[in-house]
Amino acid sequence: MDLVQIGSYTFSSRLILGTGKFGNTASMVDAVRASGTELVTVALRRFNREETDHDLFTTLADLDGITLMPNTSGASNAKEAVRAAHISRELSGSPFIKVEIHPNPQHLMPDPIETYEACKILAGEGFLVMPYIPADPVLAKRLEDVGCASVMPLGSSIGSGQGLATAGMIRLIIRESTIPVIVDAGLRSPSEACAAMEMGCTAVLVNSAIAVAQNPPEMAAAFAEAVQAGYRAKAAGIMPKSGSAIATSPLTSFLDTTS
C-alpha cells in the first residue's frame, strides 16, 4: 500500500488502534503487534507516573515502530480538551492529539461546537490535530480550514457495533476533503473496515471490535488484512453498479459459422 501522510509523518499501515476495553495489557500489546499498526491512541487517564507497569504511555512507546496519539477522552468542553492536550504532549512527547469531546455519557456523541473551538486553538499551537466528529461535511471542511491534520467522522456511535450507518455523509466528506479522512467508532467486523476503505477512506480506527473479541490478536490481524483488501480494491477500480444485467460474454456469436 502507498504510505499515509499525516502532517510531516508517514505510515505504511492504514489501521489505527484504540487501546481501551482490553482485558489486560498483555492482550492489548499482542493485538497491537498483530495488527501491524504504527499509530495508536491512548487516553491521558491511562498515564500512571507512580506505577509504570500500568502506564500505557510507557508500554506503548517502548514498542518498535509505534507512534502515540494521545486523546482527550473525558473532556466535556474545549477548555478541558486543550488542557488535556498540553499535558499529553508533555508526557508523551507526541505532536499528535485526537480531540474527543463527548459530554453526554448516554450517547457519547461528539460536541461539534466545543470540538471546533478546541481544534482551532490546538492547530494554532502546532499540534497535529485529529478530531473525532459527527459525520458532518460542513464541520469537516471547517476543521480542515483551521488546520486539522485529518478528520475522523464516526461510522456509528462509540462501541455500538452498528457499522457504517453514516456512509452517505462520509462519502461527502471524502469528496470535499483534501486531508485524510479516517473512520472512527462503530465498526464491528473486518468487512466493515474493508467497506470503509473501498469508499475511499484514508484509514480506519478500531478499538472495541478488537478488544472484546474472543481472540483480540487474531481479530486485529483480520482487520489489518481487510483494510489492505479494501484499499487495494479501491485503487484497482471497483466495478460500477448497473440497474440491469450485462452479459459477460457474447450471447449469439457462437452461432455464427464461417463454413
Curated annotation (Swiss-Prot):
The record's active-site residues are 98
* Cell compartments where the protein resides: Cytoplasm
According to its UniProt record, the EC number is 2.8.1.10
Q: Which GO terms describe its biological process?
A: thiamine diphosphate biosynthetic process
Record pathway:
Cofactor biosynthesis; thiamine diphosphate biosynthesis
GO CC, one annotated term: cytoplasm
Q: Which reaction does it catalyse?
A: [ThiS sulfur-carrier protein]-C-terminal-Gly-aminoethanethioate + 2-iminoacetate + 1-deoxy-D-xylulose 5-phosphate = [ThiS sulfur-carrier protein]-C-terminal Gly-Gly + 2-[(2R,5Z)-2-carboxy-4-methylthiazol-5(2H)-ylidene]ethyl phosphate + 2 H2O + H(+)
Does the record's keyword annotation contain Kinase? no
Q: Where does 1-deoxy-D-xylulose 5-phosphate bind?
A: 159, 185-186, 207-208
Q: Which InterPro entries match?
A: Aldolase_TIM, Thiazole_synthase_ThiG, ThiG
Per UniProt, which keywords does this protein have?
A: Cytoplasm, Schiff base, Thiamine biosynthesis, Transferase
- Which Gene Ontology terms cover its molecular function? thiazole synthase activity
Q: Which domain of life is it from?
A: Bacteria
Q: Which family does it belong to?
A: Belongs to the ThiG family.
User: PANTHER family of this UniProt entry?
Assistant: THIAZOLE SYNTHASE
Identify the HAMAP family for this entry: ThiG
Q: By what name is this protein known?
A: Thiazole synthase
Which organism is this protein's natural source? Chlorobium phaeobacteroides (strain BS1)
> Which lineage ranks, top first, belong to the organism behind this chain?
Bacteria, Pseudomonadati, Chlorobiota, Chlorobiia, Chlorobiales
